[in-house]
Structure formats: structure tokens, C-alpha cells
Amino acid sequence: MKSINTLIPDIYNVMESKEHDGDLSSIAMQAGREVEDAIKDAFTPREDNRGLRMSGIGRCERAQWYNYKGYTPEAIKGEVYLTFLQGHVLEAVLVALIKLSGHTVTDQQKKHTIEGVNGSQDCTIDGELVDIKTASAWSWENKFKESGIADDAFGYIKQLSAYGKGDKRKK
């Protein structure tokens, strides 16, 4: 049985060896559908979502309060939308590679509600709750050091903890 601890070298190995687990066509088709959905979603007008979401954990509390109270936020710029789209596309490709490298992926986009706050986790890999994140070179060097994300400025640990609470996880 594979372990999340070997995930990255396993992905590199499957890319080098071309020896994969699972049905390549089926996994590639699923990734393609997810990329298609991400592109369509990027061009779908946004609904007015004034509620709190688990993905907002770690965001500026003042900005969340203004949003929740109905104040009009600044318009999101094209480059920000492109960053979001890149993250969704890369997530689809990475999940495909994770499956092809023999790891178990479950609970993709599983919905959670904790005390009225909604969220959807990315997936569970080899039994471990995972939220797939992309990072620029600057973010990687400055926020994701070997010591981890101890200060958790983006609220990633709190967000994962909320999903874990939804699953009644102990750790």
C-alpha cells in the first residue's frame, strides 16, 4: 500500500518510467473533464456569495466582515482569475498523476458544513486529508520553508482542520 510520505517521488518515478497504475484513458478523461469544468467556471458570472466559507479562513477579518455585511468589494482583476484557473487546472493534472502513481484518491470536492460555514475539501490521498495548493517561487521560498507554515498566514491549517472536523477526524 502506498503512503502519502512517498507521493512526490512516486509521481516523479511514474513520469520517468511511464509505468503507471490504473486505466490511463479513464484517468486522463476525468482530468480533461475537470479542466473543462474549470474553464467553463472561469467564464461563468459569479453569484453574490456573501456568506462565510471555509476557504476564507485566514483572510483578513475586516474584509470578510465588509463582504458579509454587503459592501461592494473591489473588482477581481484578470490576472487573479487566471491564477485561480491555473490552480484548478493544475489540481486536475496532479490528481491524475497521483492516481497513475498508485496512490488512492477519495472524497474529491467533498462538501462540509460546520456551524453554518460551508466548504469543499480537495481530496483525501492515502487516507490523509489534503488541500492541493499552488505557489509562486516567491511564496514557496518565503512561506513554505522546511519548518512548514508555522505562522499559517493563509489559514491553510485551520481550513483543513475544519474539513477534518466535518469528517470527525481525531488528528
Label the model's feature ranges.
Residues 161:
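Active-site phosphate/pyrophosphate- and oxyanion-stabilizing loops and adjacent acidic/basic residues
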Residues 1-129, 136-154:
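Metal-dependent nuclease catalytic cores that hydrolyze phosphodiester bonds in DNA/RNA
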Residues 165-171:
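Substrate-binding beta-hairpin/strand module that engages nucleic acids
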